[in-house]
Amino acid sequence: MGEDRLTIIGDVGVDVVLGPIAEWPRVGTETLLERGELRAGGAAGNAAFAVSYLGGHARLLSVVGNDESGAWLSGQLRPLGASLVVCDAPTTLTVGLIHSCGERTFFTTPGHLEAFSYEMLRPSLAPAPDANAIVLLAGVFLTPALRAAYPLLIRELHALGYLVALDTNWPPQDWSAALRDEVAGWISAVEHVLLNDLEIRSLAGNDDLATAIDRLAPMLKSGATLVVKTGPRGALGIQDGRRSEHAAQPASIFDTTGAGDSFNAGYLLARLEGAGLAESLAAGCAAATAVIARFPRRSIAAGDLARLRVRQPVPLETPR
């Protein structure tokens, strides 16, 4: 199959992951943490790395800052097939703290991601190589200028022949009525909606997951899929009224950062191979578990997890 059938558009940044931390330290003190890693990250970056671990290839479209951190980040991402615009801004930095309970807290600077715009992105968009090609949009709330053009971007991607997958991630500004309406417009326009259970419940404004799904599913266009990532429990999906669920395998995990992004990689690679909903959910869960079970992530080489890929012939169509 063509090498650029999966494109990822969204946020990349420099991540420092530290932990575990049992309780919040007193102001003005220093705390020693047992484990840590410096790595390239962001939702789009994590997904691109996961594709590489699975032996696949994706074209990553993003931006970096014009400082030393940006140069380092470019060096980490370009081997993945990244097309990166250097913008006049400091590189976005994230510190992720892993709590002893397994939850995470993130501190992120706006940095270069605030400058990422549709005008920067548009020259890198090419016609889809076939009618099954997919673009994953990730990390929208950290890219406000690009977010403002999301309706235009989604229309443009469809005009170029792509199917569109969307993972919004969590909004730092939290959910408001206006934001819910904005996201509902995106959901109704794309082919794959990939959210976690908290995002689903928050977007629907209901704490009951089943009720939240029932509220969101009617927003989907015909043939589109709503995927709900439920963390260690696995994932479920709804497509044209049919529901499928897959339970994740239990695993001992220190750092769950990028679990949802890794799921997206496994799920979308399976879809590109022609897999149905159930098989794609299983592939996503397997990818997520395998990636986050490894720490540090630099211990995973490209192709190390290729055994998890769904592989079956899929007939290629003429682009729409």
Annotated model-derived regions:
Residues 1-61, 68-72, 254, 319-320:
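Glycine-rich phosphate/adenosyl-contacting loop at the front of the ribokinase-like
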Residues 134-214, 233-234:
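Conserved beta-alpha-beta core of the PfkB/ribokinase-like small-molecule kinase fold
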Residues 1-7, 32, 156, 206-320:
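Conserved phosphate-binding/catalytic region of the ribokinase-like
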Residues 96-148:
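Conserved phosphate-binding/catalytic loop of the ribokinase/pfkB sugar-kinase fold
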Residues 49, 93-97, 105, 234-237:
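Short beta-strand scaffold segments in enzyme catalytic cores
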Residues 58, 84, 164-165, 226:
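Hydrophobic beta-strand scaffold residues
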Residues 127-128, 185-186, 219:
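Structural alpha-helical scaffold elements that stabilize or flank donor/cofactor-binding regions
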Residues 76-91:
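A glycine-rich helix N-cap at a beta->alpha junction
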